[in-house]
Design a protein with these regions (language model features):
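Conserved class I S-adenosyl-L-methionine
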Residues: 76-86
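S-adenosylmethionine
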Residues: 100, 104, 108-217
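Generic detector of well-ordered alpha-helical packing
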Residues: 65, 83, 108-109
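Conserved SAM-binding loop of SAM-dependent methyltransferases across substrates and taxa
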Residues: 87-100
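Class I SAM-dependent transferase core
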Residues: 2-77, 112, 118-128
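Mobile beta-alpha loop/short-helix "lid" or hinge segments that flank ligand
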Residues: 36, 87-90, 133
C-alpha cells in the first residue's frame, strides 16, 4: 500500500521529497514510514503528539530532530541519550540515520515507554534501550558511556545542567537543548553555554543551545 493510499492525495510526492532531501536509503525510508504509521495509529489510544498532519510530522518532528546532524558528527559518538524522549523525538529519527551509534531513550511515562519499545521492535533497531528512570535518578544510579545528551521539549535547562555537577558520571559530556529563537540563558545556565546555532524548520526559526563543563579555548 502506497503512502497516498494510506494518507491521501499528494502524500506520495511529499514523502518522496522528504526521502530525497534527507538522502535516505531504502531501509531508512521504510523505517520512517513504519514510524509514521505507528505514530498515527498509537496516537488514537495514547496521547503522543498534537501534530498529526503528514507535512507537519515530516517538518516539525522528523526534520526538526534530524537537523542537529549539521552541527554534530554522530559518527564519532560512543553513546547518545535522549532526555524525555516522549514519542521518540529526536532519538528515533537520529537512530534510524545512525544505526551503529548506541542510544538511550529516557522516558518516565509508561504508555510512551511501551510505544518506544514497540517502535524499536517493529523497526528492527538494535543497540538502543529505553530507560524509565527520571532524570535525577538516572544521573545518580547509572554510568553509561554517553558523549551527547539531547533535550527537545522536555526538562527546563536549569534542571538539565545537573549533568555537570562534580559528582555526575556524565559531567564531561556535551548537552544540546532545542530552544526557541528568543531563549536566553539564566545565571545558572550561562557558565555552561558554549554555543548557539540557529536553524529553520517549516515556517519557524529555532536554535540549538550547546552546553559543556568546559568553555572552548
Amino acid at each position: 500500500m502506497s503512502i497516498t493510499e494510506k494518507f491521501g492525495d499528494n502524500a506520495d510526492l511529499l514523502w518522496q521529497s522528504f526521502i530525497n532531501k534527507e538522502g535516505l536509503t531504502p531501509t531508512q525510508a521504510h523505517q520512517f514510514e513504519q514510524y509514521l504509521c505507528m505514530l498515527r495509529d498509537w496516537n488514537e489510544k495514547v496521547n503522543l503528539t498534537r501534530i498529526l498532519d503528514i507535512p507537519d510530522i515530516i517538518a516539525y518532528h522528523f526534520q526538526d530532530s534530524m537537523q542537529i546532524v549539521h552541527h554534530v558528527d554522530f559518527t564519532k559518538l560512543r553513546g547518545v541519550c535522549d532526555i524525555g524522549s516522549g514519542a521518540g523525538f529526536p532519538g528515533i529519527p537520529l537512530k534510524i540515520l545512525y544505526p551503529d551509534v548506541p542510544f538511550i531513550l529516557l522516558e518516565v511515562n509508561n504508555k510512551k515507554v511501551a510505544f518506544l519499545e514497540s517502535v524499536i521492535e517493529q523497526l528492527g533497531l538494535t543497540n538502543i534501550m529505553v530507560s524509565n528512570l527520571d532524570w535525577r535518578t538516572f544521573l545518580r544510579q547509572t554510568s553509561h558511556t554517553i558523549d551527547l545528551f539531547m533535550a527537545r521539549a522536555s526538562l527546563q535547562v536549569d534542571e538539565l545542567i545537573r549533568v555537570f555537577k562534580p559528582v555526575s558520571p556524565y559531567k564531561h559530556a556535551q548537552m544540546v537543548y532545542w530552544a526557541s529563537q528568543h531563549w536566553q540563558p539564566g545565571p545558572q545556565e550561562e557558565p555552561f553555554l558554549v554555543a548557539r546555532k540557529t536553524y529553520s524548520v517549516g515556517d519557524q526559526q529555532r536554535s540549538y543551545a550547546f552546553f559543556s563543563d568546559q568553555k572552548p579555548q
